């Protein structure tokens, strides 16, 4: 019934696109009006649009002429005219939806339409890319277009300093990466004054490769961390014991990436621990005193049995560098949490660094939901449309291609073993190479790409390898990948950001070929020769069948496979794609059902022979869909827990901003509440009457907080609670009045400035400790389900109680720190104390060279950041 209805009325996507063509026709109808304008008149249109907005018009009201202006400016500046389908993509972005556009359809140019229109409000537009290279490329490239229209453009890279970051954020449009934006938000909420903050709000974001950022990286939070004291030698001691375990000692769940000791394993590891004097002979592994040992063992097992070198991480300059499982890129600066990184360092016999404590964190899910309007672009989002709509309220709109796709997608070939599969791949590549067809081979890991590279070398087939080891040459390798006879092996990273053009990427080739030539006349001659060569090579590649894309195994997500296929057949070019699989591939081995193996037996699978059948293809798709649903459920569950933390983050950051915005504080209101709480808590919680023991406890608490000694004889004569509170208030009033007078005599605003800093530092310290407590709570909360309790509700309840306790401690800590301030040599002693305290909050007493990068993540050297005053 649904298919019949779609044939009659068209799908929702078709109807929406059809309706948008009405707006496109309006833009086309007025195109000639802007063609006759001078460059200056075209630029002045920006001023006109801003005036119209100030006079009450909306962005939708000026969309048609604004898009026409951008199209005309693009023709003049970039020599590129927006196609009608690109205009549709721009409208979709402006409306806060996702434009799904095939590779090569010009997403970078499409973004200029929505970015320009929304920049007219003057509230800022963030164009988000996946790496610094693309951010800089797009800012430089599209910046010429924006500047010609009087729109300012900024670019923020990983090494951009705070001053330049602030300037960039104040531009109309800023290009940056998701990581830079997220970390800037966290760092801003660790700053000690508004003037130090760099961001100016969250108005509108256009996220390129939106599926990668909002889906694939949704489970990885951004974390600013500092090191904590711990027994790092224990990681090496435990690592040595892991080699003593056999397969019967642990149970591995590859689907969920979990590992557990069996009863046999527990007995063996306990004996080994006792033998090496790591636990007492009369204790058990699960005794309270030994629970931390269990933590070390679990992480060591995960490091050895679940995480693999050249797949999950590589070793570079003596450090473990995590590999992004979705892009294949190195994630410099990222570390596994909860001791896993240290366990891997011990496994690889590297120097084990201290574990980190979270100072601030946020997930991309919650970061991007702060924007008033959010939109995105990608070549593959339809398979994740349910999640994008459910979590981010983003509708996916499939934009038609400008010219029909001519790529041929061949059926998968399935072999018994990986060895047979690789033999078939080499044979297929060799056949393509003979007819000069360019080939791109996609692998899921560095390990597999290097196995294939060795086989190609053995067969004397010249090729290039693009993976995290050689990421510096990425742009150049991609530029060459469409040249006839070229063979390129790539991990997932190759599918992002850069087009593979048949014949080669002229702009990139010109940049590398002509870089060292100074004579303009020679450059002109060489460039013409290069253009002729690229055009000739393009024809050869087309005649050979276009780019051939080979997948060496299926990814867990259909979307990643579609991205690989999408490298071929750009803008109507011919192309070919084919996947080679084996029963030893992770997807089929872990997630494939016995049904698939049964099918293959029925089809008479023999060694060295490939099977092609629609049954198998459908079964594999079902396995992928099953994994996608599982991953979606995991992300949904994580989001529910993170939403609890996110709401608390908003409360704390809002409180922090209110402190920063306030210039004077009525401290007496705080300490009077605290005095009342001290007396009430001691009397109500522990004692019913005002007796000697009660007076001693109250006196002790007052001394602890204020360093004031109460006169025992005086307070013991007070017969009521109210009189006692009044007496303590009078004493603390007098104490603080003297202290304030003492400080203000040195400098008028000194007390208020110190109070503000103490309040900020106290809140930051307690928030850091609170995050650690929430992490611990979250780790064990699922065990509550054994007692028939909902873990999420339990987490919400306890997290709220913990926040209440934190805020109560916050006020007490403020008073305690202020009470202990000394005015003697305040500009020297306390200024140094304050700076040391601030530094310890941000980096948690890390011992670091002054010329190394600051651990806070600012990108600056330590001596120019948190080590400036040390």
Swiss-Prot record:
Give the main EC class.
translocase
Q: Which domain of life is it from?
A: Bacteria
Please tell me one Gene Ontology term that the record gives under cellular component.
cell envelope Sec protein transport complex
- SUPFAM superfamilies according to UniProt: Helical scaffold and wing domains of SecA, P-loop containing nucleoside triphosphate hydrolases, Pre-protein crosslinking domain of SecA
- Keywords for this protein: ATP-binding, Cell inner membrane, Cell membrane, Cytoplasm, Membrane, Metal-binding, Nucleotide-binding, Protein transport, Translocase, Translocation, Transport, Zinc
Q: What is its EC number?
A: 7.4.2.8
Q: Where does Zn(2+) bind?
A: 854, 856, 865-866
Name the cofactor(s): Zn(2+)
Q: Which CDD domains match?
A: DEXDc_SecA (cd17928), SF2_C_secA (cd18803)
Q: Which reaction does it catalyse?
A: ATP + H2O + cellular proteinSide 1 = ADP + phosphate + cellular proteinSide 2
This protein's membrane topology, according to the annotation, is: Peripheral membrane protein
Molecular function terms from GO: ATP binding; metal ion binding; protein-exporting ATPase activity
Q: Which subcellular locations apply to this protein?
A: Cell inner membrane; Cytoplasm
* PANTHER family listed in its UniProt record: CHLOROPLAST PROTEIN-TRANSPORTING ATPASE, SECA INNER MEMBRANE COMPONENT OF SEC PROTEIN SECRETION SYSTEM
Q: Which family does it belong to?
A: Belongs to the SecA family.
| Self-association and partners | Monomer and homodimer. Part of the essential Sec protein translocation apparatus which comprises SecA, SecYEG and auxiliary proteins SecDF-YajC and YidC.
Q: What does this protein do?
A: Part of the Sec protein translocase complex. Interacts with the SecYEG preprotein conducting channel. Has a central role in coupling the hydrolysis of ATP to the transfer of proteins into and across the cell membrane, serving both as a receptor for the preprotein-SecB complex and as an ATP-driven molecular motor driving the stepwise translocation of polypeptide chains across the membrane.
Specify the protein name. Protein translocase subunit SecA
Lineage of the organism: Bacteria, Pseudomonadati, Pseudomonadota, Alphaproteobacteria, Rickettsiales
Q: Which gene encodes it?
A: secA
């Amino acid at each position: 019934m649904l298919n019949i209805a779609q044939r009659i009325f068209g799908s929702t996507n078709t109807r929406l696109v059809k309706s948008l063509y009405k707006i496109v026709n309006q833009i086309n109808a007025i195109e000639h009006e802007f063609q006759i304008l001078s460059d200056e008149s075209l630029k002045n249109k920006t001023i006109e649009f801003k005036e119209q907005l100030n006079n009450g018009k909306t962005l939708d009201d000026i969309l048609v002429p604004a898009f026409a202006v951008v199209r005309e400016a693009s023709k003049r500046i970039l020599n590129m005219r927006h196609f009608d389908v690109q205009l549709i993509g721009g409208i979709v972005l402006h409306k806060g939806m996702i434009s799904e556009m095939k590779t090569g359809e010009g997403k970078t140019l499409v973004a200029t339409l929505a970015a320009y229109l929304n920049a007219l409000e003057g509230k800022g537009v963030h164009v988000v890319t996946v790496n610094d290279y693309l951010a800089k490329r797009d800012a430089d490239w599209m910046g010429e277009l924006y500047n010609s229209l009087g729109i300012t453009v900024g670019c923020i890279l990983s090494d951009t300093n705070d001053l330049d970051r602030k300037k960039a954020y104040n531009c109309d449009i800023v290009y940056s990466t998701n990581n830079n934006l997220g970390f800037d938000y966290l760092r801003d909420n660790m700053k000690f004054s508004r003037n130090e903050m760099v961001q100016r709000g969250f108005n509108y974001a256009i996220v390129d490769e939106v599926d990668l950022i909002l889906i694939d990286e949704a489970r990885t939070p951004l974390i600013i961390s500092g090191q904590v004291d711990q027994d790092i030698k224990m990681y090496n001691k435990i690592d040595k014991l892991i080699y003593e375990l056999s397969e019967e000692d642990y149970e591995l769940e590859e689907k969920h990436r979990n590992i557990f000791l069996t009863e046999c394993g527990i007995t063996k590891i306990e004996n080994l621990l006792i033998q090496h004097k790591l636990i007492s002979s009369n204790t058990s592994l699960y005794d309270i005193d030994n629970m931390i040992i269990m933590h070390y063992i679990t992480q060591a097992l995960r490091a050895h049995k679940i995480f693999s070198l050249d797949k999950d991480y590589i070793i570079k300059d003596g450090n473990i560098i995590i590999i992004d499982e979705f892009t294949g890129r190195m994630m410099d600066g990222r570390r596994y949490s909860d001791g896993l990184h240290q366990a891997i360092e011990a496994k690889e016999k590297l120097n084990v660094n201290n574990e980190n404590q979270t100072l601030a964190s946020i997930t991309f899910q919650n970061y991007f939901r702060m924007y008033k309007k959010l939109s995105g672009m990608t070549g593959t989002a339809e398979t994740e449309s349910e999640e994008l709509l459910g979590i981010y309220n983003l509708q996916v709109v499939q934009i038609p291609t400008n010219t029909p796709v001519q790529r041929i997608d061949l059926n998968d070939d399935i072999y018994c073993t990986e060895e047979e599969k690789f033999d078939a791949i080499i044979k297929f590549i060799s056949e393509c190479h003979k007819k000069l067809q360019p080939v791109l081979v996609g692998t899921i890991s560095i390990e597999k790409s290097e196995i294939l590279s060795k086989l190609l070398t053995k067969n004397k087939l010249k090729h290039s390898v693009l993976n995290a080891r050689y990421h510096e040459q990425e742009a150049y390798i991609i530029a060459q990948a469409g040249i006839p006879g070229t063979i390129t092996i790539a991990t997932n990273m190759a599918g992002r950001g850069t087009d593979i053009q048949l014949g080669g990427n002229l702009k990139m080739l010109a940049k590398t070929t002509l870089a060292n030539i100074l004579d303009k006349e020679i450059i002109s001659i060489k460039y013409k020769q290069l253009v002729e060569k690229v055009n000739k090579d393009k024809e050869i590649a087309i005649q050979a069948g276009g780019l051939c894309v080979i997948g060496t195994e299926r990814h867990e997500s259909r979307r990643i496979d579609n991205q690989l296929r999408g490298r071929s057949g750009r803008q109507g070019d011919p192309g070919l794609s084919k996947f080679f699989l084996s029963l030893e591939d992770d997807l089929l081995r872990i997630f494939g059902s016995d049904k698939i193996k049964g099918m293959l037996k029925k089809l008479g699978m023999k060694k060295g022979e490939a099977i092609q059948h629609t049954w198998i293809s459908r079964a594999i798709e079902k396995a992928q869909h099953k994994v996608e649903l599982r991953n979606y459920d995991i992300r949904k569950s994580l989001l529910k827990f993170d939403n609890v933390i996110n709401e608390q983050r908003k409360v704390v950051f809002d409180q922090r901003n209110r402190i920063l915005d306030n210039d004077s504080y009525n401290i007496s209101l705080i300490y009077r509440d605290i005095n009342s709480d001290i007396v009430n808590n001691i009397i109500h919680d522990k004692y019913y009457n005002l007796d000697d023991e009660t007076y001693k406890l109250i006196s002790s608490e007052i001394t602890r907080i204020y360093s004031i000694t109460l006169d025992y004889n005086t307070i013991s004569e007070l017969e009521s609670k109210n009189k006692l509170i009044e007496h303590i208030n009078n004493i603390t009033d007098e104490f603080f009045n003297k202290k304030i007078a003492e400080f203000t005599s040195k400098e008028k605003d000194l007390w208020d400035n110190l109070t503000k800093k103490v309040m900020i530092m106290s809140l930051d310290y307690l928030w850091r400790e609170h995050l650690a407590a929430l992490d611990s709570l979250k780790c064990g909360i699922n065990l509550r389900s054994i007692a028939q309790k909902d873990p999420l509700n339990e987490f919400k309840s306890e997290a709220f109680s913990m926040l209440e306790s934190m805020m109560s401690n916050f006020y007490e800590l403020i008073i305690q720190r202020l009470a202990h301030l000394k005015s003697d040599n305040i500009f020297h002693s306390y200024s140094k104390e304050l700076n040391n305290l601030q530094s310890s909050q941000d980096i948690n007493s890390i011992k670091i060279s002054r010329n190394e990068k600051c651990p806070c993540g600012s990108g600056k050297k330590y001596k120019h950041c948190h080590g400036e005053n040390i």
